[in-house]
Amino acid sequence: MNSFSAFSEMFGSDYEPQGGDYCPTLATSCPKKPAGRKKFRETRHPIYRGVRQRNSGKWVSEVREPNKKTRIWLGTFQTAEMAARAHDVAALALRGRSACLNFADSAWRLRIPESTCAKDIQKAAAEAALAFQDETCDTTTTNHGLDMEETMVEAIYTPEQSEGAFYMDEETMFGMPTLLDNMAEGMLLPPPSVQWNHNYDGEGDGDVSLWSY
């Protein structure tokens, strides 16, 4: 039994196409706008929505909340397809039938969370990604057919995160892999000393007030 079969048995077929009247909007029919950053390497997947590649070669997924500027972080995955499935289930949970999907069958093959709570969406995204994981991945499968190894889905969410939590990858945004490290090191450096090269008769090395200028 493959991962998807186990996934279907666990969650049923509540999301099968109904009467063939629903035709989801696909990412392939909505070309992406060129990125405005010309000096930085493009990290977005050329086709899949909500999918970006890290410098390590892994793929991350996130989804924008409707009518907000915040995004819900969905996780880090081994393949772009897993990240794309994670985005699809999140998009369906937040936008329903108006969601733009990476795969047409996501509309009826994925378990949609009952609420739009960030934690519920993140959990459903992880389940969807693992159910459609690449068969070439050498992983161990649990009795339910879902691979729950940390190497497959990393940093999905923590209990401390609020429902409105979102993720921003500054290192990828600014094209500087060591941006945060450099900032941290800079904060540890002492401030430069101020030397005054002025001679005042009878004053020697006395302090000079900034307001005297």
Swiss-Prot record:
Which positions make up the DNA-binding region? 47-104
GO biological process: one example = response to cold
Q: Which GO terms describe its molecular function?
A: DNA binding; DNA-binding transcription factor activity
Query: Where does the protein end up?
Result: Nucleus
Query: What SUPFAM superfamilies does the record tag this protein with?
Result: DNA-binding domain
Tree of life domain: Eukaryota
The consequence of residue 178 to S is: In strain: cv. Cvi-1
Q: What does the UniProt induction comment state?
A: By cold stress. Subject to degradation by the 26S proteasome pathway in freezing conditions.
Q: Name one Pfam family in it.
A: AP2
PANTHER family, per the entry: DEHYDRATION-RESPONSIVE ELEMENT-BINDING PROTEIN 1A-RELATED, DEHYDRATION-RESPONSIVE ELEMENT-BINDING PROTEIN 1D
Protein name per UniProt: Dehydration-responsive element-binding protein 1B
Upper lineage is: Eukaryota, Viridiplantae, Streptophyta, Embryophyta, Tracheophyta
* Gene it is expressed from: DREB1B
